[in-house]
Amino acid sequence: MPYLSLLLLFFFFSCSTNNPLRNVEEYKGPIIEIKDLNTLYSDSAQAKFKLKSEIYQVFESGEEKYPKGLNMDIFSTDNDSVSASFKANYVIKYEKENYFLATGNVVLFNYNTGDELRTEELFWYPNEEKFTSEKFVTIKTGNELHTGEGMVSNQDFSNYEILKPSGIIEVDEN
C-alpha cells in the first residue's frame, strides 16, 4: 500500500504543467565577442580599411557592434597610404542593409587636405563608398569653420557637401 501511494504521488507531480524550462529567457547577447580588435580589410591584395576597437560583438541577427568605440583608417585607392581616419564612441553595423551608424563624438579627418568633420551621428555606406549625416556638422578647413545641418561625403572625405550650411564663410574677392 505505501508503494501505491508513492506511485500515485509520483504521477501526480510528474503531470505538472509547471515546467522550469519554459521560464528560461532567450539569450539576446552577442554570439561572438572579441577584445582589442585589430583587423585589416583588403580587396584584391589592396588594403581598404584598418579597424581598431576595444570590444567587437556579433549578434545572431547579424548586427555587429563596437560598444566602446571604433577607430578606422581608410586607405587611398591609388596606393597603400592612409588617406583618412574615422572614429566614434559607439558604432553598429546593420548587416542586412549593409551600413554603419556611428554616434557620439564622431570625427572624420582627411590627411591630404587637413579637413576635419565633427558631428554626433554619421552613417557609412561601404558599398557606395560614402558618409552621410542628417545632424548638425562642423567642418574645419585650414583657418575656416563651416557648420550646418546634414552632410554627404565620399569615403576619404576629400569631396563633401553640407546640405544646409550656416554661419560665416570667408570669400576671397580676387
Predicted regions and their residues:
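Mature-chain termini and adjacent capping regions
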Residues: 1-174
